[in-house]
Amino acid sequence: MSGMRWKGLVAGVLTFALAGSAALGQTAGVVKLGYVGSLTGPHSGWDVPALEGMQMAVTEINGAGGFKVGGKAYRIEIVQEDAQSKPDAAATAAQKLLSDEDIHVVMGVLTSVPGVPVATQMAKAKVMYIGGFTAMDGIVGKPGNELSFRALDTDDTVAKGFVPVVVKELGLKKVGILVPNDDVSKTFVKAYQPLFSQAGVEVSMVEFFQPGTTDFAPVLRKFQGKGLDGMFIGYADPDAEAIIRQSLEVGDLPKKFVYRGGSGAPAVKYADKIDGFVWQILTRDLASSSDEKVKAWIDRYKAATKKDIVANTYWALTFYDAVFMLGKAMDAAGTTTDQAAIAAKLKGMVYDGVRRMSFDKDGHAVTDVDIGIIKGGKTYSIPEKVL
Amino acid sequence: MLEIENLSVSYGRNEAVRGISFAVPDASIVALVGANGAGKTSTLNAITGLVSSSGRIVSNGRVLTGLTTDNRVRLGVAQVAEGRQLFPLMSVRENLELGGYLCRAAESRQRLTVLMERFPVLAERADQFAGTLSGGEQQMVAICRALMSAPQVLLIDEPCLGLAPIIIRKVTAILRELHGTGLTILIAEQNASFAAAVADRLILLENGRIRAEGSPNEVLGQPQFRQAYLGV
Amino acid sequence: MLLDIIQTGLDGVMVGSLYAMVALGITLVFGLVGILNFAHGQSVMLGAYVCFFLVSAGHSFWVGAIVATLAMGVFGALLERAVFRRTLGDPFAGLAVSLGLIMIIENVAAAALTPDPRFMDAPVSGNFAVGPLLLSSQRSLVFVISSALILGFWLFLQYSTLGKAIRAMSQSRQGAALVGVRVDTVSRSIFAVGSALAGAAGALYASLFAVTPFMGAAPLTKGFILAALGGLGSVPGAIAAGFLLGLAESFGSRYLSASFRDGYGFIILIFALLFLPTGLFGAGKARV
């Protein structure tokens, strides 16, 4: 190809592009939005739906002509990297996104092991990052981390509304706590114990079991004959299911269970043998919702992904609303590149999307969540007003 | 009759037996004598197939070469191995019963009864762990265990090792008695005077080769004998 | 209080019987072949999956358990033929190979079956009262089955011809060969028998606990503690040690701390090695 013809082609393409954007009304820009998450490996059950939710939001925004900043329309383009459920791969993925100078905001990662290296690198590079994993709570709000956000509520935030609802729903008076002997459990036991007391429930014993325990019979015996009516059973599905199953086996133990995890799966098989099981849905209940906004979102999700709703699908709502909020924050800040200004606008913004959500002054999400309940053989959910 | 032709045994580069040939005539006792490491045990172990060997081994017209140990036992060859190799945590009865491992149960029971009648001490100790017996008693159990398979050829490695003189006399008596029943016996023995007392023929081994062969008096009188034993 | 102690004791012997089954296979293979088979735990895991999938497909637990046992018997025989036969006489090679096998089998299982824990429907559920005692139905069933298998296996070793040959071989390989025992064949069969026992233990584990690709690790470590505690190669030692460990864990978790559960076994082992350096039943006394 000769130099002349090449230049001519470039000019032609440019003209076409300009004409195309002119058709949208104004000269359109493109905002690159980074996504990092485990698209493969054991953590993909969280991060694949999370990416799907982001893609839905982006498609919807772009389909409506993009979002406006200072009267100019912008389209969003997602640049995605796979963290492979491993911390080293996650760090590499984060580096790749950081090397693209057009990326000013990154979202993704719902699990702590690959999440921590991503969040720390983003904070160090002063790039705005909205994550979802629990350990993010220890990063958000620290001096120097003003650009770090978490799109899911902290334990404390959820617990405040969760405990009173649970106590009322299950009619609890005296509970025992049986959780793994690890940092996560120790932190949330500290948060939940006083909340139970405030709700008029006596926490008569707390037992920590060795992580990886499969046989709970001996430790469950400690809870026998204590007049308990409920058990608080940690945050991991396999532990919770084993404890429920073995409580029924051992006998003479409470049949009401409070679960800090995000799924009703541990109790499904035992629904007609137990008196109650409650869990936390950190976004919205998709399985048995009566909320019109949720129902409409489900239809859009099915159309966009050609997938059915499964137990993990609700993680797709982690970043869905946050993408819209980001657009509004950029508009309010009048910039798509000044991260400090955008972050400042995001903090304190209240957004009534599929989730009703906001970010506090530190960057922690404060959002309404749903509480999942299995009782009397039925599965349903009730909304928890947090905001 | 047990015939050995050009038998060699080697462990890696170390040749323990170097192409020896000899025969044990029916109903006779032949003793392999020689110092430690002369190749006596290797020869016995090669005959029962515990170690691999080259050459030809024929027992009562049946070629044993290449057969597994259990098949050689089936063809009537039994061995009392070095160290007796009893099952120390099994009772005397179980040890003897295992001697009839390849035989029919009825035959085995019958032989056990006969042996216990012949050696009342076995019956007395029947329920005791073999490991708790005295050395002489253990030797007796080991020989009787080998007899349980009704062998035609019996190989015994060091029948007197570690035994008191009074016990050695008893073992001698037993071997003579077995000899009287027409059993073909090959023993490997370091104790030359014992070997001379029980055997019809002696074969002197040194460094895996036969140095002398003949009646006990012939072999004991030869200068090679003193050389092989005393290294002079 | 007394009632509680009895209940806790029963919990202990129930899991102890499972531990003993796994330790039995390890100690047998070591006693006869001199190989510490670290891949033994994988037979537990694969047996659990075989049972899980059969039960999930609508077959009864009994079909699942029997097929798991037989399948793991075949698996043990294949492992012996393909791998351990080549490492005979070289314990270090055997050790290295079995460690490698753990990695391969576990990771292939994790890739093919996903690492998600699965729970199988047990043939019986709930609990029943015996006087003032409240017993878990499935645990009682597991205890009965595993005790029957252990007792059956012990009787097999004591009284059957092959069982006597196995014991004889563990006490004197040469002596056994000279009475006509085919020592090679018996060595091979012991891999199959040990692995089949582990498969049966796996099916029983699956009826109580979660099935995961990594579930073989705990029974394996415990099996080794037990085999060492009982005196390597000793069948009565391994059985006694299995029940002892079950009791220690059960009483430790109940009356001390549940967060130290797996530590109790090691404490017993350390004390045993200090004060009974040759295992529960002394040096070479209580072999197979």
Predicted regions and their residues:
Chain B
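Glycine-rich phosphate-binding loops of nucleotide-dependent enzymes
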Residues: 1-232
